[in-house]
C-alpha cells in the first residue's frame, strides 16, 4: 500500500484508489481531475463518459496555452476546453476501482463524493527523434501519479434544501424591492 498525501478525516466512511507512473499526459489529467473534484461518483462517471463522447468538455484553466475555444466550456464559466479521451479513460478506470473498494468496505455507493483527487508528475521517459544533418532531439513523455479518495456524503432532508433560500439571492432582493414599491405607492 502506497502513501497518500492526505488522509481522510473519517477513514471508516471513505475509500481510496491510486495509480503510479501512468502513461497519460500530466497536464490533461490535471485539468480533468480538477473538473471532477467534489462531484458525486455517479455524476463524475457520467461526465467522463460524456467527455469521451465529446458531449461535454473539460475546461482548461491552468494549462491553457494554445488551447482552442469551444462553446461547451461556457457552462464552466470559461472559453477554453478540450476532450482529453485518454485522461478520461484512466480516471474512469480509477473511479471504478474506488467504487469496488467502497463496495468491498460496505459503503453506500450512491452517496459517494470525490473528496480528494490529486495528480502529480512522474519521472519523464526519454526517447529520441532523428533530425536533419545528423542531429537528435529528445522525445519526452510526461506520465503522472493519481490518487483519490471518496467519502460518503451526509444525507440531508430534501425539504430543508428546497424550502430555504439564501438571504442575498436575486429572487429575494427582487421580492423585497417589489414590497417596498407597493408600500410606497399605497402610502401616496
From Swiss-Prot:
Tell me if Ribosomal protein is a UniProt keyword of this record.
Answer: yes
Annotated region Disordered: where?
Answer: 155-188
Q: Which PROSITE patterns has this protein been placed in?
A: RIBOSOMAL_L22
Q: Which InterPro entries match?
A: Ribosomal_uL22, Ribosomal_uL22_CS, Ribosomal_uL22_euk/arc, Ribosomal_uL22_sf
Keywords recorded for this protein, A-Z: Ribonucleoprotein, Ribosomal protein
Pfam families noted in UniProt: Ribosomal_L22
Keyword check for Transmembrane:
no
| SUPFAM superfamilies assigned to the protein according to its UniProt record, in alphabetical order | Ribosomal protein L22 (SSF54843)
Q: Which family does it belong to?
A: Belongs to the universal ribosomal protein uL22 family.
- PANTHER family tied to this protein: 60S RIBOSOMAL PROTEIN L17
Q: What is this protein called?
A: Large ribosomal subunit protein uL22
Originating organism:
Agriotes lineatus (Lined click beetle)
Q: Which gene encodes it?
A: RpL17
